Regions:
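Short amphipathic beta-strand segments in non-cytosolic proteins
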Residues: 87-108
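Positively charged n-region of N-terminal signal peptides that target proteins for export
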Residues: 1-5
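Beta-strand-rich domain onsets/edges
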Residues: 24-67, 73, 80-81, 155-157
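Aromatic sugar-binding surface patches on proteins
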Residues: 113-121
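Bacterial N-terminal signal peptides
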Residues: 7-19
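Surface-exposed edge beta-strand/loop patches
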Residues: 121-157
């Protein structure tokens, strides 16, 4: 008789864990949706990749440079967007001691084709630990509508 409540409790616990696991996985993704656009992004040290938006020599010698890479998808069709212009404004972590490194930097993300896939990217300075806010202004070719998307990147050393 005592084992029946234990089995029910165990089943309830398994159901609870099963419901919470997908939410935790979604929190770790680097994907943001806004309007008609889904944005997938990644940030990696520039020394580990070919440099876009800068020379390879600069990327390999400067440990503070990171490469922001963005892939755009049309939410209604799921197809990759290949004809966009993206301007990014990167704001560094806030500092109470100094505002030197919090000055926003604006950059135009450059399109790069790898096979059939188009991504957009640029190098930026991420020398301080903390959360970087990256504001994207996305315009598709032939459209005047600008889609604004905010990405958050938590720089940890």
């Amino acid at each position: 008789m005592r084992s029946k409540p234990f089995v029910v409790l165990l089943a309830w616990l398994a159901l609870l864990v099963g419901q919470m696991a997908p939410a935790a996985a979604n929190d770790l993704t680097r994907s943001v949706t806004s309007g008609d656009i889904a944005v997938n992004f990644g940030v990696v040290p520039a020394s580990q990749t070919a440099a876009a938006g800068g020379s390879a020599a600069d990327a390999s010698s400067n440990v503070n440079l990171y490469l922001l890479t963005v892939a755009l998808f049309d939410r209604s069709t799921g197809k990759r967007i290949e004809n966009a212009h993206i301007t990014a404004v990167v704001k560094g972590p806030r500092s109470e001691a100094s505002s030197f490194h919090t000055k926003p930097k604006q950059m135009q993300l450059e399109a790069a084709r790898d096979g059939n896939a188009v991504t957009y990217g640029h190098l930026f300075d991420a020398r301080w630990k903390g959360i970087y806010h990256i504001d994207l202004a996305i315009t598709r070719d032939g459209s005047t509508h600008v889609e604004h998307v905010r990405l958050n990147y938590d720089q940890q050393f």
